[in-house]
Amino acid sequence: VLILASASLARHSLLEKAGIPHHSMVSGVDEDGFEYSSASNLVDSLSLAKAKSVQAKLRQLERNSFSQEIISIIGCDSVFVFEGQIFGKPKDVEEAIDRWERMSSKSGVLMTGHAFLYRPLLLDGNRDLFFNGLIHEVIATRVEFADLTREEITGYVSTGEPFQCAGGFALEGKGAMLINKIDGCFSNVIGLSLPWLRKALTEACS
């Protein structure tokens, strides 16, 4: 069983549609308190902090059947980088509209940090109890936006969707109509690269 260290409905939906058994557990990590040297460093650090926070919570649980079934934890964090500036979720309508007016007909990069903790197999065939295995990587996908009118921008912002997503857009939602194309992993833009997770799960289970 996989633990998703996130309350993100988008990430939960990705795993559910892919048929990956999992449970969600909120990490409680304060995302505003992190120092970072780059966007890549930020999402890498935050994804690992989220996974380790859930790891600590699991260690406090009694060794019941549920906790014994858990063999891996994944933490993720995403930001959108546009013209060298890091965009998280827009704080208000004015900021969301301003961003969209800047992004119209241009492109940026959605970065998602992935931190996968797992219980490696020991020589006796049992699994390590403390999630000492770690695989982590930042995946980047370029997103190109359509040439949008002011009316299209304000209409999209009025749906409320931009306030739920890094960068202020949801590829899996209404924002899809405002995107011309992507270069890279589709699910990474939604918040979790499924091809990357498949490789991590394969390594953890071997």
Question: For each of these PLM feature ranges, what is it?
Answer:
Residues 23-31:
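A short beta-strand-loop structural module common to alpha/beta enzyme folds
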Residues 12, 22-23, 114, 136:
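Histidine (H) residue identity feature
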Residues 3, 38-206:
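Anionic-ligand binding patches
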Residues 7, 27, 119:
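Cofactor-binding loop segments of dinucleotide-utilizing enzymes, especially the Rossmann-like FAD-
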